[in-house]
């Protein structure tokens, strides 16, 4: 039967990571549990909600864990309650002892807490991914790609393919990440170094958001595997599995205008433009159509927003450069604010075709690697 002692902080950190995959709203009751597997070489914590699964391995020689294993086995414990109990234990070291009928005794200092466990045999078998070709990437790079795209996914479940980020390896040796909710789009291209893994998949936005909390060391390299309907992200101790969204993602390249189609090219200070949109949004949230109007006439660039109930906003913008024709176009300022949040460059380039065609945003001096697209709103 299981028996081990471990540093509470190291164990608690592993619990926190694993619990990212455990939800309360699951169709299989066993998936509200945490599975603990103890072997001579270490402890594995397993959590899953059916869509995301995490295996977190604490090796016995982990210096921070100060682990001593006296007995092996496996058990299921109520995840949320167990995490709360561990966090309240008084001493730095905790002892975990399995008793009869899967009861667990936690000892820390003068505290003893008994928990009712369950046989691990009732836990669903997690689908394994066969290790074949893989792609290695730094956590920091993956997080950047996800941040630059995931905000544009749809929240409407009636079109599932748009609730995830489309990831595709291209014949040009690049990774393409793209997301759209049909009102806006964000696309990122990243050169890859000799990747053997070829794929065309849709990764759910919920998996992406959890990924950021699971892999916290931005400088480490992780390995990516894909098999059937699953994607695996793995480092030395954590295996993070995600189900993929079924379906074919539309060709978004056709949405990006040709260079010759643009009739107006503007460059702004990104921070100034965002602050202007923030002020305009104060009024647009009070209106039914929620739009701001951008009017370009000669050297003048003006934003306006009106609310019959509240008032109006009129602000002149300074364009760092302007090439092309005059234009008046209306759009949702929320979309532009979201787009500017993920652009790190100090200056942003915005190009227009007409007042009824989508316009594009890019960091200034950026080539085709990162482009965003926003659809205007037709107003009377």
Curated annotation (Swiss-Prot):
Compartment(s) of residence: Cytoplasm
GO terms under cellular component: cytoplasm; DNA polymerase III complex
Entry-linked SUPFAM superfamilies: DNA clamp (SSF55979)
Subunit structure: Forms a ring-shaped head-to-tail homodimer around DNA which binds and tethers DNA polymerases and other proteins to the DNA. The DNA replisome complex has a single clamp-loading complex (3 tau and 1 each of delta, delta', psi and chi subunits) which binds 3 Pol III cores (1 core on the leading strand and 2 on the lagging strand) each with a beta sliding clamp dimer. Additional proteins in the replisome are other copies of gamma, psi and chi, Ssb, DNA helicase and RNA primase.
Main location: cytoplasm
Keyword set includes Transferase: yes
InterPro entries with a match to the protein in the record: DNA_clamp_sf, DNA_polIII_beta, DNA_polIII_beta_C, DNA_polIII_beta_cen, DNA_polIII_beta_N
Record protein name field: Beta sliding clamp
A molecular-function term among this protein's GO annotations: DNA-directed DNA polymerase activity
Key words of the record: Cytoplasm, DNA replication, DNA-binding, DNA-directed DNA polymerase, Nucleotidyltransferase, Transferase
Lineage, top ranks: Bacteria, Bacillati, Bacillota, Bacilli, Lactobacillales
Pfam families the record matches: DNA_pol3_beta, DNA_pol3_beta_2, DNA_pol3_beta_3
TM segment ranges: none
Gene Ontology biological process terms from the UniProt entry: DNA strand elongation involved in DNA replication
């Amino acid at each position: 039967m299981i028996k081990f002692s471990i540093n509470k902080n190291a164990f608690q950190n592993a619990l926190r990571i694993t619990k990212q995959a455990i939800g309360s709203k699951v169709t299989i009751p066993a998936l509200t549990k945490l599975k603990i597997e103890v072997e001579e070489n270490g402890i594995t914590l397993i959590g899953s909600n059916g869509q995301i699964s995490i295996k977190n391995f604490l090796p016995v020689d982990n210096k921070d864990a100060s682990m001593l294993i006296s007995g092996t086995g496996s058990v299921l414990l109520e995840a949320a309650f167990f995490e709360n109990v561990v966090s309240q234990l008084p001493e730095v070291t905790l002892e975990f002892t399995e008793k009869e009928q899967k009861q667990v005794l936690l000892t820390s200092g003068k505290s003893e807490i008994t928990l009712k466990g369950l046989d691990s045999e009732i836990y669903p078998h997690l689908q394994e991914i066969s290790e074949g070709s893989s792609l290695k990437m730094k956590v920091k790079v993956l997080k950047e790609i996800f941040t630059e795209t995931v905000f544009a996914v749809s929240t409407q479940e009636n079109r599932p393919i748009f609730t995830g980020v489309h990831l595709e390896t291209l014949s040009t040796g690049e990774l393409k990440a793209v997301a759209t909710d049909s009102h806006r789009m964000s696309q990122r291209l990243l050169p890859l170094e000799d990747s053997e893994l070829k794929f065309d998949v849709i990764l759910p936005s919920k998996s992406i958001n959890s990924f950021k909390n699971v892999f916290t060391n931005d400088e480490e390299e992780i390995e990516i595997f894909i098999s059937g309907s699953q994607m695996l992200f793995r480092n030395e101790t954590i295996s993070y599995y995600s189900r993929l969204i079924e379906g074919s993602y539309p060709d978004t390249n056709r949405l990006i205008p040709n260079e010759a189609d643009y009739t107006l090219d503007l460059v702004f200070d990104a921070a100034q433009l965002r602050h202007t949109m923030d002020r305009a949004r104060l009024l647009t949230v009070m209106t039914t159509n929620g739009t701001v109007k951008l009017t370009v006439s000669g050297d003048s660039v003006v934003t306006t927003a009106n609310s019959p109930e509240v008032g109006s906003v009129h602000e002149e913008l300074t364009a760092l450069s302007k090439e092309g024709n005059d234009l008046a176009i209306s759009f949702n300022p929320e979309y532009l604010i979201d787009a500017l949040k993920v652009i790190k460059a100090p200056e942003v380039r915005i190009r227009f075709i007409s007042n009824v065609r989508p316009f594009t945003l890019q960091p200034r001096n950026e080539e085709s690697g990162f482009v965003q697209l926003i659809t205007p709103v037709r107003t009377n």
